[in-house]
Amino acid sequence: MIYESLHDWFQSPLGAYLREREQAWLDQVVPDIFGFHAIQLGLPKFDMLRESRIVHRVTVSPEPMPQGNHVQAQFHELPFDSQSVDLCVMPHVLEFTENPHEVLREIDRVLRPEGRILVLGFNPWSLFGTRKLWTSKGYPWQGQFVSLVRIKDWLQLLGLEPASGRLACYIPPCDTDKWQRRFRFMEPSGDRWWGVAGGVYMLEAIKKVHGMRLIAPAWSDQKMKERKFAAAARYKQTQPGLQRVDAAGRTDYSRHLRVVK
């Protein structure tokens, strides 16, 4: 069957099987990413940020959507300020865009320093990639599958350092539940025996700005100074040695920490 959109394909038995594994990885990763703003590029009907603790979350796609937290925009022209986004999820965006480099540059622009990007993509070096060789019509086979190695190179050129990730979906891309059940024995051993051949990869990268020093809040610095001052005030250096003093500065002769002879 030929699917006219990626969303329709993800509702097929094979697409649902793949999306279930991608969502499981996202549900594990996004709760540990904090910030103020998160965006999801594409597939607006699927809430891939459902487990995120970031309150302000929006989806972005070129198509209009009736839901409230949706922005209609092109991926290479995001309507967000520079360095304003803490988390960006890209579910299979780069395979279906004419200029993936331009999209990545735009994401790098809107990401804050230490912001995270989660890239989901089809692995060309897998059984999914093999099927694409003889099936190039419809979604997702008409897309340009980009290898994980190349994605990492593109990200690193922009200062986005890969931090973690995994591959999944080692079964052949069967379109029916019956054949999927027969091949599910391949999933548990996939990471061990053919880890690079997963049908999809899921990659987390962090935006690094070299030469940048993170500045703690002013109240934090003030509290640290007060603690250091209070600790230093309890002791004073005298000629015979280091002695304990009370809050008023009087020497406490009942306990010597160290005596210098």
Q: How would you describe each model-predicted region?
A:
Residues 1-31:
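Class I SAM-dependent methyltransferase Rossmann-like catalytic core
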Residues 28-78:
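Class I SAM-dependent methyltransferase SAM/SAH-binding core
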Residues 76-88:
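A short acidic, Gly/Pro-enriched loop at the edge of an enzyme's catalytic core
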Residues 101-116:
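A short glycine-rich, Lys/Arg-flanked "PGG" loop and its adjoining helix->strand segment in the class I
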Residues 116-145:
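Conserved class I S-adenosyl-L-methionine
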Residues 142-165:
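Short alpha-helix
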Residues 163-188, 196-198:
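Conserved catalytic loop of SAM-dependent methyltransferase domains
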Residues 185-261:
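C-terminal lobe and adjacent flexible extensions of AdoMet/dcAdoMet transferase-like proteins
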